């Protein structure tokens, strides 16, 4: 790695900082980011090696929000990433990050990774501020052998969330992913590839109380405010989520995806929630998720300075929740049934474009996009549900200006809007006024239009015999229900 870094610094010294950054932060590469899900496609990721280290801080304040996710967060992020060409046919890459965050006003959720495990969360009506630490690292290796390319990547992330006052929630997660891919050059630069992924996820969470003056009631939620009354109200509730997931796909491309690519992937996962408050363990729910994804893109050169691209994609996800029923004999619980009681279907179709104009001292890139999404969510026992149909459209822009051989300024404004085409409320009351109010508030949030404006500004500069430094700032405002949610962030770092 040290040899690779030394080579990188020498190579970048021979180029202007502008050309180095244009390659390192290629907007076209970001446009076809999903193409690199197959690690065997990383051979065309970059024409040169690069590395980056940065530290950032952000403050996100939300006036309109989903209570189970909190009203924003603030905290520190430290991250590093690198892509190294060890030899013409051998590449390695990796990244690592650490976050220390504080999330405010989390309510009706005493778990992490809500979108992954919902609706089977542990919840109470009090909640509070949440401290969260995240660790993540990943590493990949690629080898070219004549017409064959073989590559693999391993990534691991872990979280710890906790609260230092009642209800004293503590949750830890671990997420291991192993990716592998193979591609074969069938003719000239046309390639066919296959890839696969294995994922193992675990979450352990508990809620404890120290106050002698009383405590809130804890629910084992099962969707739309309904809960598992047999396991509700524990004095020291503790749960485990365990998930195994598999995914595989195929890929066809030309010129390492720079001319065109097409890929399809399908996957399945199974997440089981168990109760382990006592010495006994009981399965509470099982959440199965089946996914299917399609994406294709085509790129064109127009004259010498113009580059065009168009991409279209489709994705489908169907989550099915099964719930366990037990006897009421408190001396010894025994399973009576397992039945499907929840389903969530999510279908998305998208199209986006790319236009890039390049000169020796500046580049302009525009990426417009449009997306159509349909979400249907319902449960049985009792019947309840909701449906949303959304349209999204927006524009991401990037302007990079060379000030001198050692100074570059980058300006990235963006805009997007979510429009609710249809929303259907078929919710049933849970019989608890506080719970019903939360469920209705959550529905109204999802049934609201959202308009977002933001911009990123970054200044890179290089001093003699030192790596290049950068400072950056970001601001975003989001309008929802006639109120504004605001985000501000700043970062500093080095590239080499």
Positions of predicted regions on the chain:
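Residues on the lipid-exposed face of transmembrane beta-strands in outer-membrane beta-barrel proteins
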Residues: 78-84, 137-143, 178-184, 248-254, ...
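Transmembrane beta-strands of outer-membrane beta-barrel pores
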Residues: 55-61, 98-102, 143-147, 156-160, ...
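Outer-membrane beta-barrel translocator domains and adjoining extracellular loop/strand segments
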Residues: 62-68, 105-111, 162-169, 205-211, ...
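Long, internal scaffold/assembly segments composed of regular secondary structure
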Residues: 226-368
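Outer-membrane beta-barrel "beta-signal"
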Residues: 14-17, 188, 484-496
